[in-house]
Amino acid sequence: DATVAPFFFEVVPDELGLRAALEAAKRAGLADPLPLRYAATRDAAKEDRMTQRFVPDYQGTAVWTSLGAMYLRLLQRADPDAARPVLEAYRALVERDGTVREVYDGNEVSLVPYRGTLGIFLADEAMLWGTILAEGFEEHPGS
Protein backbone atom coordinates (compact mmCIF):
# COMPACT_ATOMS: atom_id res chain seq x y z
CA ASP A 1 0.00 0.00 0.00
CA ALA A 2 2.68 2.47 1.03
CA THR A 3 4.52 1.95 -2.23
CA VAL A 4 1.70 2.98 -4.53
CA ALA A 5 -1.04 4.85 -2.64
CA PRO A 6 0.79 8.16 -2.03
CA PHE A 7 1.57 8.50 -5.73
CA PHE A 8 -1.70 7.06 -7.03
CA PHE A 9 -3.80 9.46 -4.95
CA GLU A 10 -1.38 12.28 -5.80
CA VAL A 11 -0.52 12.99 -2.17
CA VAL A 12 3.14 12.82 -3.18
CA PRO A 13 4.25 14.27 -6.54
CA ASP A 14 5.79 11.79 -8.98
CA GLU A 15 9.02 13.80 -8.99
CA LEU A 16 9.58 12.92 -5.33
CA GLY A 17 10.24 9.28 -6.03
CA LEU A 18 7.66 7.47 -8.14
CA ARG A 19 10.24 5.75 -10.34
CA ALA A 20 12.34 4.80 -7.31
CA ALA A 21 9.30 3.40 -5.48
CA LEU A 22 8.25 1.27 -8.45
CA GLU A 23 11.80 0.01 -8.95
CA ALA A 24 12.13 -0.79 -5.22
CA ALA A 25 8.92 -2.84 -5.31
CA LYS A 26 10.18 -4.75 -8.34
CA ARG A 27 13.62 -5.37 -6.79
CA ALA A 28 11.96 -6.59 -3.59
CA GLY A 29 10.01 -9.20 -5.59
CA LEU A 30 6.63 -7.55 -4.98
CA ALA A 31 5.87 -7.09 -8.68
CA ASP A 32 6.56 -10.65 -9.82
CA PRO A 33 4.92 -12.72 -11.18
CA LEU A 34 2.50 -9.78 -11.36
CA PRO A 35 2.11 -6.70 -9.17
CA LEU A 36 1.47 -6.33 -6.36
CA ARG A 37 2.18 -8.53 -3.37
CA TYR A 38 2.56 -7.66 0.29
CA ALA A 39 5.65 -9.87 0.59
CA ALA A 40 8.02 -11.70 -1.75
CA THR A 41 8.12 -14.77 0.48
CA ARG A 42 5.70 -16.20 2.98
CA ASP A 43 6.35 -15.70 6.68
CA ALA A 44 3.98 -18.16 8.38
CA ALA A 45 5.13 -16.92 11.79
CA LYS A 46 3.28 -13.65 11.12
CA GLU A 47 -0.01 -15.43 10.44
CA ASP A 48 -2.41 -16.21 13.26
CA ARG A 49 -3.54 -19.83 13.64
CA MET A 50 -6.89 -19.33 11.91
CA THR A 51 -5.22 -17.65 8.95
CA GLN A 52 -2.66 -20.45 8.71
CA ARG A 53 -5.43 -23.01 8.75
CA PHE A 54 -7.93 -21.52 6.30
CA VAL A 55 -6.25 -18.81 4.18
CA PRO A 56 -2.49 -19.23 4.47
CA ASP A 57 -0.35 -16.62 2.76
CA TYR A 58 -3.44 -14.53 1.98
CA GLN A 59 -1.63 -11.31 2.86
CA GLY A 60 1.80 -12.57 1.89
CA THR A 61 2.80 -13.58 -1.61
CA ALA A 62 -0.74 -13.47 -3.00
CA VAL A 63 -1.16 -10.95 -5.84
CA TRP A 64 -3.67 -8.23 -4.95
CA THR A 65 -5.29 -6.76 -8.04
CA SER A 66 -6.31 -3.55 -6.27
CA LEU A 67 -2.69 -2.70 -5.57
CA GLY A 68 -1.59 -4.18 -8.89
CA ALA A 69 -3.99 -1.94 -10.80
CA MET A 70 -2.61 1.12 -9.03
CA TYR A 71 0.96 -0.04 -9.64
CA LEU A 72 0.18 -0.56 -13.32
CA ARG A 73 -1.31 2.91 -13.76
CA LEU A 74 1.71 4.45 -12.04
CA LEU A 75 4.06 2.40 -14.19
CA GLN A 76 2.20 3.61 -17.28
CA ARG A 77 2.91 7.18 -16.16
CA ALA A 78 6.55 6.56 -15.25
CA ASP A 79 7.65 4.06 -17.92
CA PRO A 80 5.07 3.17 -20.58
CA ASP A 81 7.33 0.60 -22.24
CA ALA A 82 7.84 -1.30 -18.97
CA ALA A 83 4.10 -1.14 -18.31
CA ARG A 84 3.13 -2.85 -21.57
CA PRO A 85 3.87 -6.47 -20.52
CA VAL A 86 2.19 -5.92 -17.14
CA LEU A 87 -0.87 -4.51 -18.87
CA GLU A 88 -1.00 -7.47 -21.25
CA ALA A 89 -0.64 -9.96 -18.39
CA TYR A 90 -3.55 -8.36 -16.52
CA ARG A 91 -5.59 -8.23 -19.73
CA ALA A 92 -4.96 -11.97 -20.25
CA LEU A 93 -6.15 -12.75 -16.71
CA VAL A 94 -9.34 -10.72 -17.12
CA GLU A 95 -10.05 -12.36 -20.47
CA ARG A 96 -9.29 -15.83 -19.11
CA ASP A 97 -11.42 -15.42 -15.97
CA GLY A 98 -14.11 -13.19 -17.46
CA THR A 99 -13.82 -10.91 -14.43
CA VAL A 100 -11.40 -9.07 -12.17
CA ARG A 101 -10.49 -11.24 -9.21
CA GLU A 102 -9.52 -9.73 -5.88
CA VAL A 103 -6.53 -11.97 -5.22
CA TYR A 104 -4.44 -14.45 -7.19
CA ASP A 105 -2.22 -17.16 -5.76
CA GLY A 106 1.25 -15.73 -6.24
CA ASN A 107 2.85 -19.15 -5.88
CA GLU A 108 1.10 -20.57 -8.92
CA VAL A 109 2.78 -19.97 -12.28
CA SER A 110 -0.60 -19.71 -14.00
CA LEU A 111 -1.86 -17.18 -11.43
CA VAL A 112 -5.01 -19.00 -10.39
CA PRO A 113 -7.59 -17.22 -8.23
CA TYR A 114 -6.61 -17.53 -4.58
CA ARG A 115 -8.34 -20.37 -2.71
CA GLY A 116 -8.20 -21.23 0.91
CA THR A 117 -7.06 -24.64 2.05
CA LEU A 118 -10.44 -26.32 2.47
CA GLY A 119 -12.16 -25.08 -0.65
CA ILE A 120 -14.51 -22.85 1.34
CA PHE A 121 -12.96 -19.62 0.08
CA LEU A 122 -12.41 -18.34 -3.43
CA ALA A 123 -11.15 -14.85 -4.24
CA ASP A 124 -13.96 -12.39 -4.85
CA GLU A 125 -14.76 -11.37 -8.39
CA ALA A 126 -16.09 -8.32 -10.25
CA MET A 127 -14.02 -5.98 -8.13
CA LEU A 128 -14.75 -2.27 -8.47
CA TRP A 129 -11.09 -1.40 -8.96
CA GLY A 130 -11.35 -3.21 -12.25
CA THR A 131 -12.20 0.25 -13.54
CA ILE A 132 -8.58 1.24 -12.87
CA LEU A 133 -7.48 -1.65 -15.09
CA ALA A 134 -10.12 -0.75 -17.67
CA GLU A 135 -8.64 2.75 -17.97
CA GLY A 136 -5.28 1.21 -18.75
CA PHE A 137 -6.80 -1.20 -21.26
CA GLU A 138 -8.69 1.63 -22.94
CA GLU A 139 -5.59 3.79 -23.28
CA HIS A 140 -3.63 0.86 -24.72
CA PRO A 141 -5.93 -1.43 -26.73
CA GLY A 142 -4.71 -5.00 -27.09
CA SER A 143 -2.72 -6.19 -30.02
Which role fits each region the language model picked out?
Residues 60-86:
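Active-site-proximal substrate-binding groove within the catalytic cores of carbohydrate-active enzymes
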Residues 1-64, 88-143:
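Extended glycan-interaction surfaces of carbohydrate-active proteins
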